[in-house]
Amino acid sequence: MEAGERIDASQLPHRVLETRGHAISILFGFWTSFICDTYIVLAWISKIKGSPDVSASSDEPYARIQQSRRQCHAEEDQSQVPEAG
């Protein structure tokens, strides 16, 4: 095989394809988690900036972030359907 030559997926051993699929799934999970966490933080910041009463309890935002994070991860888990093999 020459440098830069592409390999057809049918030429790869099954184990390589499984590993690649698993790695893509993990990366997708991290990416989804990052997007969810970023959205939660930005929403929280905009709410704080727009709130006239900034002296609210410091525990309350943390609890809301954790609840939103759990909801986001639950939606992520439901969206991942196992592949038929």
Curated annotation (Swiss-Prot):
* Keywords from the named record: Membrane, Transmembrane, Transmembrane helix
Q: GO terms for CC?
A: membrane
- List the membrane topology term(s): Single-pass membrane protein
Superkingdom as given in the UniProt entry:
Eukaryota
The ranges of region (Disordered) come to 51-85
- Which compartment or compartments is the protein found in? Membrane
- The main location class comes to membrane
Q: Which residues cross the membrane?
A: 21-43
Q: Does the keyword Acyltransferase apply?
A: no
Name the chain's protein. Small integral membrane protein 2
Q: Which organism is it from?
A: Homo sapiens
